[in-house]
UniProtKB/Swiss-Prot annotation:
It is found in: Cell membrane. Pfam families: 7tm_1 (PF00001). It comes from Macaca mulatta (Rhesus macaque). Glycans are attached at residues 15, 175. GO terms for biological process: apelin receptor signaling pathway; blood vessel development; coronary vasculature development; G protein-coupled receptor signaling pathway; gastrulation; heart development; negative regulation of cAMP-mediated signaling; positive regulation of angiogenesis. This is Apelin receptor. Residues 342-351 have a biased composition (Low complexity). Keywords: Cell membrane, Developmental protein, Disulfide bond, G-protein coupled receptor, Gastrulation, Glycoprotein, Membrane, Receptor, Transducer, Transmembrane, Transmembrane helix. The chain crosses the membrane at residues 31-54, 65-86, 100-125, 147-164, 199-223, 247-270, 290-312. Homodimer; dimerization inhibits APLNR-mediated G protein and beta-arrestin signaling pathways compared to monomeric APLNR. The record marks 85, 168 as: Required for APELA and APLN/apelin-13 interaction and signaling. The lineage of its organism: Eukaryota, Metazoa, Chordata, Craniata, Vertebrata. GO terms for cellular component: plasma membrane.
Length: 380
């Protein structure tokens, strides 16, 4: 994930076309405003997610909560840097904070990009194991804990983001008094080979940070949807409404991720390849101008997840209500009652066939036939 507006200088490469660059002036005010909005919503929402996860006892935490908490930490780590980038953009890409903050804030952006998508992938794989391969899931949990898995994901994200810490620097913009925060490959490349590093790092970050994880997520949710559909085909008509709800949650997760990230990665990759393919001037300038807005869309994902939790996860809604009520018994009682009713209604559509826990001929069904409850379908 790159800071959006200063496209060329972010990668440390000049536009090799002879096109005359014309900026979309509206971005100078609009983009900083979006950054600050994401900062406010992201710090509040992700802080609330962390509070919700860690306020519950260890026994009540779901297997996916470690990934949810890790995702919130990644988003929170990123959004706290947004005031710096908002200032940078508002000052027409003049960096006043020094070289170290340029390196660190840029590094945290990339750590967030990798850590977030890896956590989402880990969460998707966790749901796949819990729903599609419950036996393998139980065996795997005996060997690898969620904490160990997320630690590995964070180490991998930190290593993949390291080139930014190495190559990011500040420098005076030619013929101006502005100081820019950009990628400088001079320590490893000549001026003529800068583009190779630019293209190599840009395409590899898109491949590792989007294409591969997104493919894994799609695969996991495909098998999850297939398993859920097979389960509900065995139920009566009243189960169809729950079936549609569960499948819609899966679609929302995948589509939201794609809508937030695909424009950014697509535009970035097209621009990187422009050094090789030599796009027409109009198209090249369009990519340069639209990229900051694609970046803003990807940034929105860092504050969007808490709203998805609030919409789809009854337990998260109950925790939020409890906090807003400040522990008042009347409000807490109402929230508890409402949550209980929703939970009962939600799980009944998953576990019941002709009667409560009854199979054909009135035979008692075993608990293992209920792997599709709210507990295993926790959303992203």
């Amino acid at each position: 994930m790159e800071e959006g507006g200063d496209f060329d200088n972010y990668y440390g490469a000049d536009n090799q076309s002879e096109c005359e660059y014309t900026d979309w002036k509206s971005s100078g005010a609009l983009i900083p405003a979006i950054y600050m909005l994401v900062f406010l919503l992201g710090t509040t929402g992700n802080g609330l997610v962390l509070w919700t996860v860690f306020r519950s006892s260890r026994e009540k935490r779901r297997s996916a909560d470690i990934f949810i908490a890790s995702l919130a930490v990644a988003d929170l780590t990123f959004v706290v840097t947004l005031p710096l980038w908002a200032t940078y953009t508002y000052r027409d890409y003049d960096w006043p904070f020094g070289t170290f903050s340029c390196k660190l804030s840029s590094y945290l952006i990339f750590v967030n990009m990798y850590a977030s998508v890896f956590c989402l992938t880990g969460l998707s794989f966790d749901r796949y194991l819990a729903i599609v391969r419950p036996v393998a899931n139980a065996r795997l949990r005996l060997r690898v804990s969620g904490a160990v898995a997320t630690a590995v994901l964070w180490v991998l994200a930190a290593l993949l983001a390291m080139p930014v810490m190495v190559f990011r620097t500040t420098g005076d913009l030619e013929n101006t008094t502005k100081v820019q925060c950009y990628m400088d490959y001079s320590m490893v490349a000549t001026v003529s080979s800068d583009w190779a590093w630019e293209v190599g790092l840009g395409v590899s970050s898109t491949t590792v940070g989007f294409v591969v994880p997104f493919t894994i997520m799609l695969t996991c949710y495909f098998f999850i949807a297939q398993t859920i559909a097979g389960h509900f085909r065995k139920e009566r008509i009243e189960g169809l409404r729950k079936r549609r709800r569960l499948l819609s949650i899966i679609v929302v997760l995948v589509v939201t991720f794609a809508l937030c990230w695909m424009p950014y990665h697509l535009v970035k990759t097209l621009y990187m390849l422009g050094s090789l393919l030599h796009w027409p001037c109009d198209f090249d300038l369009f990519l340069m101008n639209v990229f900051p807005y694609c970046t803003c869309i990807s940034y929105v994902n860092s504050c969007l997840n808490p709203f998805l939790y609030a919409f789809f996860d009854p337990r998260f809604r109950q925790a939020c209500t409890s906090m807003l009520c400040c522990g008042q018994s009347r409000c807490a009682g109402t929230s508890h009652s409402s949550s209980g009713e929703k939970s009962a209604s939600y799980s009944s559509g998953h576990s019941q066939g002709p009667g409560p826990n009854m199979g054909k001929g009135g035979e008692q069904m075993h608990e293992k036939s209920i792997p599709y409850s709210q507990e295993t379908l926790v959303v992203d």
